[in-house]
Amino acid sequence: MALDQEVKAAIIAKYGKKDGDTGSSEVQIALLSEQIKILTEHLKVFKKDHSSRLGLLKMVGKRKRLLAYLKRTDYARFTDIVNSLGIRAK
């Protein structure tokens, strides 16, 4: 259920500020969003996989905290990432 290396590299290239930028908030949010999509599809098939459900909830919480940080520090970047990923955010 982990991201493929090619998918991860494509996300980093799209949302990173420079080559190899894996630590910026936008990249972290985009990577978490992709993992959340994959895990959501997994849980639609395997409804009783409670350990994966717990991991999903942790990822959603982490993404929520990163979005709150980005909203607090740079609102323009926050709106860009939310619109490009199609995330509902308050």
Swiss-Prot record:
Domain of life: Bacteria
Keyword entries, A-Z: Ribonucleoprotein, Ribosomal protein, RNA-binding, rRNA-binding
One Gene Ontology CC term in the entry: cytosolic small ribosomal subunit
Keyword DNA-binding tagged: no
Stored Pfam families: Ribosomal_S15 (PF00312)
GO function terms (MF aspect): rRNA binding; structural constituent of ribosome
Any GO BP annotation: translation
Subunit description: Part of the 30S ribosomal subunit. Forms a bridge to the 50S subunit in the 70S ribosome, contacting the 23S rRNA.
Function: One of the primary rRNA binding proteins, it binds directly to 16S rRNA where it helps nucleate assembly of the platform of the 30S subunit by binding and bridging several RNA helices of the 16S rRNA.
Record family assignment: Belongs to the universal ribosomal protein uS15 family.
Protein name, as recorded: Small ribosomal subunit protein uS15
Organism the protein comes from: Aliarcobacter butzleri (strain RM4018) (Arcobacter butzleri)
Lineage: Bacteria, Pseudomonadati, Campylobacterota, Epsilonproteobacteria, Campylobacterales
